[in-house]
Amino acid sequence: MKMLDLQQELRENAYPGRGIVIGKSEDGTKAAAAYFIMGRSENSRNRIFATEGEGIRTQAFDESKLTDPSLIIYAPVRVIGNRTIVTNGDQTDTVYEGIEKGLTFEQALRSREFEPDGPNYTPRISGIMQVENGTYHYAMSILKSNNANPDTCCRYTFTYENPVPGEGHFIHTYMHDGDPLPSFEGEPKLVKIPNDMEAFAADLWDSLNEDNKVSLFVRYIDIKTGKYETKIINKNQ
């Protein structure tokens, strides 16, 4: 698979929706994750990321403008033991609770499907990272309608064992802007993961469409120690 320029991918797409990037730093020492949200409506743009425990939660920036909290207020990132869960909806909790019960990432997501926001039927995208005893692997998932047919849910899971240093994968909800919004197609895209978390976060944020970008979360986890650094950027301040 050809490696794509992540910044160029974002600059050329005004509305990829929500996106997850997971991979390994070039020097092989860090497990990396990024999650961004975008919005076209006032309700969707009226959000920030706020720290909650070891993860984050979306919150309304201006509570008086919040018209519908369903599908937009949730915990995108949660940590359970040596696993970090990143998703674009409340399926974060589904995966967390599934792991508590002994289910795998894929098994936990069997109880969920795409969002009920027809005619878009926004895909549920999810990722999980496991850092244990100096080893690291990750998986990504997308649950989507069958070409906007809500009678069928298509389930895809991609697992990456012993990822290559400097490589990561990018999955997002929409191919591009549209009405209705077309769901992501194909495998997660191969992208480069640099060593510098701050620079990575800045490049991602600068590349997202100025009108539509809302918030960005980036985390680098030391594969040997499990310690992590986090960067959160909110357009609303």
Regions found by a protein language model. Give the residues of each.
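Conserved short alpha-helical segments that host acidic/polar catalytic motifs at enzyme active sites
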Residues: 1-237
